[in-house]
Amino acid sequence: MLTGFRLKGFEFAEMDFMAPAYWQNAVSSEAVDALMTAVRANRHMLRKSVISRALFTGKSVMEVWDLNAPAPLRREIHIPYEEALEKIKEVGKVLDECIPETFDLFVEKGWVEVRQLPGKQNGAFFQGILSLNEPRIFSTYLGSFASMSQQAIMYGHAWHFWLQRGLPAQERKIPRALMEVAGHFFALLLFEEIQAKAASAEEKLEALWQELTFISNYVINMGVRFDFERSFFEERKKGVVSVTKISNLLSEAWQAWYGESTAGVDPYLWINRGQFYKIDDYFYNYPYIFGTVCAYGLSEIRHRMPEVFPKIYSEFLQNSGRMSVDDLFKKFFKVDITQPEFWESGLKAMERKIAVFETEARKYSEKSVPENS
């Protein structure tokens, strides 16, 4: 019903149904096309983020219900929130020495909710309150590696918001795609830090496992959602779409992205993902792909110019409500995101990280085999 209403409005306005999504994200269709073309060309490589984890568990493909499972290592871990926050603050110093005390302020002010409570759902959500110049993190922290990386994403959002405090409200409307850049870049910094300073092979492998989960969730799975939603809109133009047809569209999109890396599909994906039913956002899926691939691309730039990157990155975030995404990248990073080079650099960084996981997983498995076996 919502899609039919939207399509009728687009018909009257004589516009493509993707146009509002581009406007909301302040990004050009050419940039999104360049991103998606690069990602589609690398789907075979990206599937290794799923297959490599499946092989480590002794299977050739991943069961759908295991896509978000933690690393199957012998030790059980619970990371206290205080420890997780210390790691996140330490990572933040790479960008700004003020980040640790700023994040402490967020906690002291009661702006961060992480408790486990009866009936409280898992997950995390960020909201900036413009009228108060205050960030809010609403979440349930579970003590897992995945939960810690989720907190890093939330603190990345909060830092982005904090950098813009004091600017006029009309200059603080952050495009969704750039919100995801800020959050996902912070998660990447956390992955890098833990892998570099891991006290054991298990800890390093856990961080790599979570990073591959991060890649498959935010690139492959979001690719499924993007293609499915576009296909659904095209079908809805013709009339009412049956449940069977919707399920078939999802299966086709799943197969196109996951290929043979999973055993079956998630049949309820189109039902249980609230992003398909949001009335204020159009196509809230490709911004995650944008944010993730972009974060890896920016990480490559950071390693090439570590001395000047923090200042440039801060100015990039501060100005994210003042100009288009395309213009931001041109001004601060001298990058044309309508061309494939930047996106391909991010995807190559993902490929290298998958290779590192495969190497570490092989070494760990060899050590775990008894000598007399």
Task: Place the predicted regions along the sequence by residue.
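Contiguous, non-catalytic segments that form substrate-binding/exosite surfaces or channel walls
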Residues: 1-136
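Short, glycine/acidic-rich hinge or "gate" loops at secondary-structure transitions
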Residues: 4-7, 50-65, 101-107, 167-174, ...
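C-terminal, non-catalytic "cap/extension" segments appended to globular domains
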Residues: 4-6, 12-17, 22-27, 55, ...
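Active-site recognition of the HExxH zinc-binding catalytic motif
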Residues: 9, 142-165, 180-188, 228, ...
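Glycine- and acidic
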Residues: 19-33, 66-77, 132-145, 161-174, ...
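Inter-helical turn/loop segments and adjacent helix faces that build the functional surface
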Residues: 26-30, 52-53, 95-98, 162-170, ...
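Generic structural signal for well-ordered, non-transmembrane alpha-helical segments
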Residues: 33-47, 86, 181-184, 248-252, ...
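Post-HExxH zinc-binding segment in Zn-dependent metallohydrolases
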Residues: 174-203, 210-213, 217, 291
